[in-house]
Amino acid sequence: MRPLRSLFLWAAAALCLAACGTASDDAVIPHPASVEELPGSFRIHAPMALSVEAPVEAAEALTGYLKTTPLPIDTAEPDAAKNYLRLELSDDERIPASEEGYVLSVRPAGITIAARGEAGLFYGLQTLLQLHEQFGSRIPAQRIVDAPRFAYRGLHLDVSRNFFDKEFVKKQLRMMASLKLNRLHWHLTDGAGWRIQIDRYPLLTEVAAWRRGATWQQWRDGGAKYCRFDDPEASGGYYTKEEIREVVAYADSLHITVIPEIEMPGHSEEVLAVYPGLSCKGEPYSGGDFCIGNDATFEFLENVLTEVMELFPSEYIHIGGDEAAKTAWKECPKCQARMKREGLESVDELQSYAIHRIGRFLAKHGRRLIGWDEILDGGLAPDAVVMSWRGEEGGRTAAAAGHEVVMTPGGYCYFDGYQDDPTTEPQAMSGFLPLEKVYSYDPAPADMPGREYVLGVQANLWTEYIPTAEQAEYMLYPRLFALAEVAWCQPEGKDYGAFRERALRYTELARSRGYNTFDLAGETGERPESLEPAEHLAVGCPVTYATRWNGGYPAAGERALTDGLRGSWSYKERWQGFLGCDVDVTVDLGEVKPISEVSADFTQWYSAWIWLPARVEIEVSDDGNDFRRIAVVENDYPETAERPEYRTFGWTGSEQARYVRYHAIPNERVGGWLFTDEIIIN
């Protein structure tokens, strides 16, 4: 049994610990499992006498770390009877079995942290540091018994779409440590730029790391071309090997493992632009998929991974594996020859062949392959770990089959989407993920088959629309606080109201440390129209569709447009989607009635190819055969506006009718969507 999974099994037993959220007067995030209030308090009035009962290397590391914190310590009197801070490695049965668990005792005479492993002592210190931040020099006496639910508690950082320097990465590592997160998934390569020095292939950092256009969006708008590092308009960058060693060592000192991601076989436009012989067509800018039929592809990938493994001691190496187009493989003679030789019947199996081959290479070097859930396609390599991002189905499938998984579904864990009213927030990727929804996530619910194979959970920050360090932090915090509690706390004790109060306080603490956070205190919250059922004449009335909704966005199906339920800020919730066609529906009110209003809301999301209608036509009828037009509403909102928008298209007046036809005509963009949520009739 692997250590990560054994921790999950320990957490399931819960050690009879109380649920998260038992104390209302502290701001520790993630909230400890058990907090017992004791009489009195400990006053820090002078440097605390530090003693560390641990092997020399661990003792030196913990002492060195403490010297970088605001806690005053004195190493001259380790046996002091008061005003002490004692760190003890112990196998006492009262200490949680997890190497990351700890017991923190704050008493008037001093403070003791006991744990089975160095990581547990470190996390006990993180709790103490947060208590010190909140209470200052007088910390209430208490006994905390704590341990994590999951062993994998991660943050993914995309530095390809927009590059962030090593100091930014180290700053986020410090926050991760405070939140007891322990895995940084470093997305180092993608079509937007290569970010790691590889000595054997210098063009990766001389050209593939650079582009014209200060941001990902400007680069895309300019044709998505790369340039040499010495081009006057060059923008981008990469990490030298020395910088990577520095980051990895710094992370290790904070008990964080850095997992590198090298994308393959897709998302590799930047590689194929400078080494086009590795593509199926042999030409630059001809696609983003490596040629799997070419042995030179595997020579390149193995050489790159060899240098990567020299820099990263992580057990896991992430190879991407997502969103390969696979189109060129169908026509490529080399790929087709490979399929014939290997007895492969589909391009999915060809991708699986590539993943298996790379997995075997990593295994020879004592490493394990981890990849996005597309690595399930065509058959999963025996020892591979699945990172489930396209919802939860991939993770559930893998876990049920006995494969280890990390849950990171976009609907709960993708922090590149809007966290508040999209009409007022800075531009982001499509989607709406507020703090409360992040907090609500359970990566391994009780009814999930194979839940013991869920290693943990991860937040993902993709950076297409995040050009600056300040914006990256704005998108991370406080949502990463919620993810930290999802990863650490047992689900039965979670309480969003209590957490939000902690998050409000911790947001202020984060700002005092120099982090740029979202203003949680000023949060707008969910779209007001979605909070209460709408009351109007058409509620519950049958709707006839001349054009049917798209199966990917059905909302409530035939009832969606008259169920009284309005859409949220997210077009994925209660909005009905129509792809490449009109919205042409007729509502039957049951009998002729006086009407004074007909309207419907539409939303526009430029990044998701969702548009407001070009115009709306509204007609009424007494018998359902003869209709008279009562309104034509033209759209005056620009198609090029990139900020999400919500607009009402309707009519007011005085009419008598039983049938109301609402006809929305899309603009001329091929492949565009229309999204509406309710036909309001009064």
Q: PLM features: residue spans?
A:
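Active-site neighborhood of glycoside hydrolase catalytic domains
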Residues: 271, 280-281, 285-382, 389-396
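Bacterial N-terminal signal peptides that target proteins for export
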Residues: 1-9
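Contiguous, structured surface segment used for ligand recognition
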Residues: 20-152, 471, 483, 487-513
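Bacterial N-terminal signal peptides
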Residues: 9-18
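Predominantly extracellular/luminal regions of secreted and cell-surface proteins
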Residues: 532-566
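Aromatic, loop-rich ligand-recognition surfaces of beta-strand-rich domains
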Residues: 566-631, 643-682
